[in-house]
């Protein structure tokens, strides 16, 4: 879905979505200068909103996402190479 619909579905502004993209919290596909958001973006957005509801700052959320993605990378390496 496009950025305006993604923002509407998640009841946040388009500027907020762009800010999350700039921080690397959401990584949508980009085609011809337009962002497209899939189910992975939606899951990440739901996590962001939940962490914010719990009182985490965006920097803390960014760190949590880093650890989450690092864990996936380590699992991939274990499954691939060992």
Each language-model region and where it sits:
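Short, hydrophobic-biased segments on the C-terminal half of alpha helices
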Residues: 17-18, 48
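Conserved active-site tyrosine of GNAT-family acetyltransferases
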Residues: 20, 37
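Short, Lys/Arg-rich nucleic-acid/phosphate-binding segment
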Residues: 30-35
């Amino acid at each position: 879905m496009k950025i305006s619909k993604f923002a509407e579905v998640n009841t946040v502004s388009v500027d907020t979505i762009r800010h999350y993209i700039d921080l690397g919290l959401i990584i949508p596909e980009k085609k011809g200068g337009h962002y497209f958001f899939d189910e992975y973006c939606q899951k990440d957005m739901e996590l962001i909103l939940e962490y914010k509801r719990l009182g985490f700052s965006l920097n803390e959320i960014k760190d949590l996402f880093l650890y989450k993605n690092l864990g996936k990378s380590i699992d991939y390496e274990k499954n691939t190479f060992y």
